[in-house]
Amino acid sequence: MVISSEELLFENRSYAVPQIRIQRMVKKGELIPLKRGMYETDSTAPGFLMANAILGPSYISFEYALSYHSMIPERVMTYTSATFGKNKKKEFTNSFGTFTYRDIPQEVFPYYYNRELYGNRPYLMASREKALCDQLYIAAPIRGIHDFEEFLFDGLRLDEDIFDSLDSEKIKRIAPLYHKTNLYQLEKLIEKEKR
């Protein structure tokens, strides 16, 4: 479970110096530091469970979500998340791994991510469509439709069967909100595939 310094100080308020108690808990491995002022109590928990807590608001997206949904063949080791209003890429490294956060437009942020459960622990994960759109948002602009297809299926190594099964209505709804060339190309490609 993710817990903040404030919560720990409150829980340990009966101690004369609760900060020393917290330091001892860290040394014993009862608390694992995630970032300044934030800890995890379960050393065996998978890192993706902490991604939303380390920096919020956020949901897991980009390469990690594409891999999670089996859309790309690579296993992604960095926990990649979407956020907004941070104005630059943020990165945190701790004993659970590396966590990166990238901005997407605020108006598209609330669409198409799901609350998933791992045991009884919730986390937020982008849908397949949203993960792809987020990834295309941060990619360098690709002008021609042929080059765009090559980027999707050879560069990203996107699974073509999964691509064909994506919900085109979701993509049509959010793609224009990104205001990026790659998302317009994605809309064009989907229209071409439908014919």
For the regions a language model picked out, list residue spans one by one:
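Hydrophobic alpha-helical interaction segments
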Residues: 113-195
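Short, mixed-charge, low-aromatic patches
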Residues: 6, 16-24, 86-94, 126-130, ...
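Short gly/ser-rich loop at a beta-strand->alpha-helix junction or flexible surface loop bordering the NTP-binding
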Residues: 30-39, 50-111
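Short beta-edge/loop segments at beta->alpha junctions of small alpha/beta modules
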Residues: 1-63
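Short coil/loop linkers at secondary-structure junctions
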Residues: 14-15, 72, 181
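Short, structured interface segments that constitute the first stable element of a domain
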Residues: 6, 13, 96-122
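A residue-level signal for beta-strand positions that form part of recognition/binding surfaces
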Residues: 2, 98, 155
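Short acidic (Asp/Glu) patches
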Residues: 45-46, 83-87, 114-119
